[in-house]
Regions:
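Acetyl-CoA-dependent GNAT
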Residues: 1-54, 59-60, 72-74, 78, ...
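Conserved glycine-rich acetyl-CoA-binding loop
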Residues: 36, 51, 59-73, 80-82, ...
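Surface-exposed beta-strand edges and their flanking turn/coil or helix-capping segments
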Residues: 43-44, 52-56, 66-68, 102, ...
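C-terminal "cap" of GNAT-fold acetyltransferases
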Residues: 85-88, 92-130
């Protein structure tokens, strides 16, 4: 979802996270703040040693509280628990604040791996070696 608009690839993953992520060895995490769900992220398994995090969303009313950082750190931890070697992400150039966070956490710019389904809107691909 980019600026509130669903892209062609989004409806299936948003409406069927069980099939899109969980049944394929992935995970979905939610963030609670003041007893409310205010954020989420999906962790998609690309292969035995590789994951991609996707669909990171934080409620605008709770941004700048470190929630995105905590969700990404949870993804990193789960990847390590599953003995993954790399964590990937796709993003657009319209999200410079997110890019700063990704760099701070240890992600770097890379070319897409062959097992990644690159979305039409993707303008930047990043990876963290674990």
């Amino acid at each position: 979802v980019l600026k509130g608009k669903l892209e062609e690839e989004d409806p299936f993953t948003l409406h069927h996270p069980d099939k899109a992520y969980l049944e394929k060895g992935g995970f979905v995490f939610f963030a609670l703040y003041d007893k409310k769900v205010v954020g989420c992220v999906a962790l998609k398994r690309l292969d035995e040693e590789t994951f991609e995090f996707a669909k990171l969303f934080i409620d605008p009313a709770t941004r700048k509280l470190g929630i995105a950082t905590k969700l990404i750190e949870r993804c990193i931890t789960r990847c390590k628990e599953n003995e993954a070697k790399q964590l990937w992400l796709q993003t657009t150039m319209s999200m410079p604040q997110a890019h700063k966070l990704y760099y701070k956490l240890g992600f770097g710019d890379r070319e897409a791996p062959k097992q990644m389904e690159v979305l039409k809107r993707t303008e930047k691909i990043m990876c963290m070696d674990l």
